[in-house]
From Swiss-Prot:
Lineage top rank: taxon: Eukaryota
Protein's recorded name: Putative NAC domain-containing protein 94
Keyword terms of this UniProt record: DNA-binding, Nucleus, Transcription, Transcription regulation
Organism (species): Arabidopsis thaliana
Listed PANTHER family: NAC DOMAIN-CONTAINING PROTEIN 94-RELATED, PROTEIN CUP-SHAPED COTYLEDON 2-RELATED
Any matching Pfam family: NAM
PROSITE patterns associated with the record: NAC (PS51005)
Amino acid sequence: MVLVMDDEESNNVERYDDVVLPGFRFHPTDEELVSFYLKRKVLHKSLPFDLIKKVDIYKYDPWDLPKLAAMGEKEWYFYCPRDRKYRNSTRPNRVTGGGFWKATGTDRPIYSLDSTRCIGLKKSLVFYRGRAAKGVKTDWMMHEFRLPSLSDSHHSSYPNYNNKKQHLNNNNNSKELPSNDAWAICRIFKKTNAVSSQRSIPQSWVYPTIPDNNQQSHNNTATLLASSDVLSHISTRQNFIPSPVNEPASFTESAASYFASQMLGVTYNTARNNGTGDALFLRNNGTGDALVLSNNENNYFNNLTGGLTHEVPNVRSMVMEETTGSEMSATSYSTNN
């Protein structure tokens, strides 16, 4: 936007360099940097606002540059002169007091909005501490923007291409670069690592919470165990399994359910016959784990406990309710543990 003022207004206006524009952010695109800002600098056309400072960045280490910039929080822009490193060479000198800048690849062309012309070149560089032989890579990065020069004729068309050879010969004995190569815009920034460290959380067993079904109150409900815990518990109780007897069972409770509650200390919510009589499932509704007893194992447990006629110890109540099909649901047993 161009501001036009009459003489009276201009006398009462602060200097442009002293004006701070609240909310202003400088985020130019690559095309805007080379086609507007860099081109105006090469043509010696100044701007009313000093958005990009003129600094020889190779006289400073990158961590000292942010305080020299006109603005910027994470990116800083500078007009930088491109001095030759060697005579008869267009390669600039990129050595600083504490290290050096090293290119990470070749120049990338920047095209006009209509994508028909190459209007600039972009190079990425990374800063290394120390000297070239033993340099240590840092997180400081730079994007260098420059206009195409006569030596970059393959990137763009030059009206004076026939004079290219003569122009280069005239500059072979000088460290001064052609006007297009004399200045570059350098964007300085520090690369941040987005990888966040993740804490290693140790895995632990979480005991399930038994919901209140509003049908019965439990003062001391035994904890449901996972199948692995049940099998481990079985191995410690093998010497306490009672000898089988021939007396008929006097309880409607299934032998396997009694074995689970008394021999293993397991409180289970659902005893399910799968419809074929092949297996009895003891399901832990809190975790989804299950202890599956095969038909042979079920018969074995029936033989072990089927003849018991005495009162079942440590059992207060048992409510049985028949459901459709071959399913039988039994409420959890309450113990005096």
